């Protein structure tokens, strides 16, 4: 059982990290099918071992996060994600479930699944009032000013609807030709976008709407949320409403009568997908009859009346010209295939990841082989295997490198890991540069203007050798402006301002920026919330660390080893001396208008289920405003159980014991949420 629980926790940590990369960083590190496979494995394990299923599992949450850059807005109706189908059997099961729930589906509507960023647009008095990203499904980001720059989205709808509040949902995307043009026009020091989806998401989240307008985003609308209020009875009729009101709607949308016709549409979409001017990664199937949606129902994560069929990854073949070796910030050695340029998913591909030498050996990949590749979410595609029928007669197996490609140190494998590593972590130039690149990145200290190219130039000029040196760049101003760095006075001032702003970031960002092995952004946030200060964390023992949710033995040992290293202790002290914040800053803002209900004061609470805010935040409200005690288990001494979505066994026990239950909706109403 311990092994099963550990596997479930491992999958949850991976999926949480991948969700963060996809929704917050707009920079996924794994392809969709790897994510989907992990999610399916998690769901299967949780179904088989329900005692290990928690309410904060990725399997019951809508993917996504709310950015700190924009105002947070609560959706009037949750923006749920869709369950996935991967073959005809999944679609037939979806159909059978629908037939069992309702006899009047009125067929299905089949739509392209646009690979972009979901958006909800609200019209009041027939005028565009507000635009909100999906976010975490409950709360999104207000991006109204940016949406107003997109030509596909009308600012007004027909005046006959001025007495209605109309909510329309769709997908913001970037067409291939606009994506290529934008990447070509980026400054040399700017990071290129990996793909149109990343470009669309990153652009829509820009704080400068002139940049949004310049980059030419597009949008398809596909859902009229309050169609029934307008007397519309079918989803296909609501699509016509969108067309009539000048919204851009895909001309690939069709209505069919049976699930067999839906399955036939897969072939149709597969044939046209590579000829489209935009990226699609599947099709969406919705029941046509709007009047049965509530009858068929919802889970906490997705509607049961719709499903997404995901295309398998596109696989193409190209010749392997060379294997390139590199070293990353942790000393890990990477193997990258340089291939004959080939078109894949709308972009020219010249490189593909080979992971490590064991992967090359297992697949028996050789120079000049014809290799199969597929596009992942990242810039570099993945290698799927070798076409042995095209192997040259004189080919020889590839030999592993034994020395670091940067500093020539002898490579080692630690604890039987598959990865080779350079252990010269303080003397290797490439490792030091990659540490700085990671430190300044968006999900770390977010120092804008410090591009990879500038970091390399500053390193070669001995201006920065470690991350602490960044905070002394101001004193080198005259030298930098006079040198051949192509940095002007205004750019330098902006860079220094960004460096100074980074000093005020909360502890979890600094902890992430250190790049400690096994400590990603999610765990860093939990550690910061638990220990509050860098000093307390530095002195935490193994038991205290592993008591933190999601901090396993590997992460705990890695933290202890990192803080026991004199180089790292010195670095922390240097950063503290220049004024970098070393404390956790709570980003939860309490509402001064919370109603204080006297009957809740000084009582004992148990919290179960999911809410629009975290349980820690609810616990803080109860303790701060009600002086309540919050316990983990229900007993006869429990006064109230606060029950959210998908409440579990604690709710059942409360009912058996006769404990008072506060439902989520009543809690929100009582507290002005």
Curated annotation (Swiss-Prot):
Family: Belongs to the NAD-dependent DNA ligase family. LigA subfamily.
Functional note: DNA ligase that catalyzes the formation of phosphodiester linkages between 5'-phosphoryl and 3'-hydroxyl groups in double-stranded DNA using NAD as a coenzyme and as the energy source for the reaction. It is essential for DNA replication and repair of damaged DNA.
Broad class of enzyme this protein falls into: ligase
Protein name in the entry: DNA ligase
InterPro entries documented for this protein: BRCT_dom (IPR001357), BRCT_dom_sf (IPR036420), DisA/LigA_HHH (IPR041663), DNA_ligase (IPR001679), DNAligase_adenylation (IPR013839), DNAligase_N (IPR013840), NA-bd_OB-fold (IPR012340), NAD_DNA_ligase_OB (IPR004150)
Domain BRCT stretches: 595-673
Keywords from the named record: DNA damage, DNA repair, DNA replication, Ligase, Magnesium, Manganese, Metal-binding, NAD, Zinc
Cellular component annotations (GO), alphabetically ordered: cytosol
Pfam families, A to Z: BRCT, DNA_ligase_aden, DNA_ligase_OB, DNA_ligase_ZBD, HHH_2
Cofactor: Mg(2+); Mn(2+)
Highest taxon listed in the record's lineage: Bacteria
PANTHER family attached to this UniProt entry: CHROMOSOME TRANSMISSION FIDELITY FACTOR 18, DNA LIGASE
Residues of the active site: 113
Amino acids binding NAD(+): 32-36, 81-82, 111, 134, 171, 286, 310
Gene3D superfamilies reported in the protein's UniProt record: 5' to 3' exonuclease, C-terminal subdomain (1.10.150.20), 6.20.10.30, BRCT domain (3.40.50.10190), DNA ligase/mRNA capping enzyme (3.30.470.30), Helix hairpin bin (1.10.287.610), Nucleic acid-binding proteins (2.40.50.140)
HAMAP family membership: DNA_ligase_A (MF_01588)
Molecular functions per Gene Ontology: DNA ligase (NAD+) activity; metal ion binding
Lineage: Bacteria, Bacillati, Mycoplasmatota, Mycoplasmoidales, Mycoplasmoidaceae
